Amino acid sequence: DFSYVWQEFAYIITEETKLLVLLNHLADTLEERKRLFKKVDAANIIEYREKSGDYMQRIVFACDEVAELLDKTGADKARKELLAQIEARLALIARQGRAFGIHLILATQRPDANILPGQIKNNMNIRICGRADTTLSTIIIGDGRAAEQIPHDAQGRFIMEDGTVFQAYYFNDDTISKW
């Protein structure tokens, strides 16, 4: 779904085995950052930057349709084991990554417990919802009316848990290629 211009700015993975390699690398990076933070007695990335003088970059992992990724329906034993490893790495990063500057953006159409495991869902500190029916709105932000009030023609408009409505940017290939 992504043209060549996005590959300059993001590492796009479509194979589960390659994804696990990346997630293992992120888990290793998390452990390395823990060691570095401990050396300077920093509780989070902001303190680490202040105390060490090192402007450590944040890392953002984004997954569009995480439900599709984690769906075990019809999977054989080997694939289920692979997906369990992926899920475990995502859960680790969701639990510990934020303080160490490693962040997850996980998108799904239906963020219920059957699709997004509690270990991951409960550790995502911000939930955003686009236009949705009452049930989905309630699942995400607890207000059965909020997300359904976004106009049908408001493409890219979202609402946060606290009721803040915002308009997302739209980046087309031409815009990206000019950077």
Indicate residue ranges for each PLM-predicted region:
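P-loop NTPase catalytic phosphate-binding loop
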Residues: D1-A43, G53-G142, A146-I150, M160, ...
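Conserved AAA+ ATPase small/helical "lid" subdomain
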Residues: Q149-W179
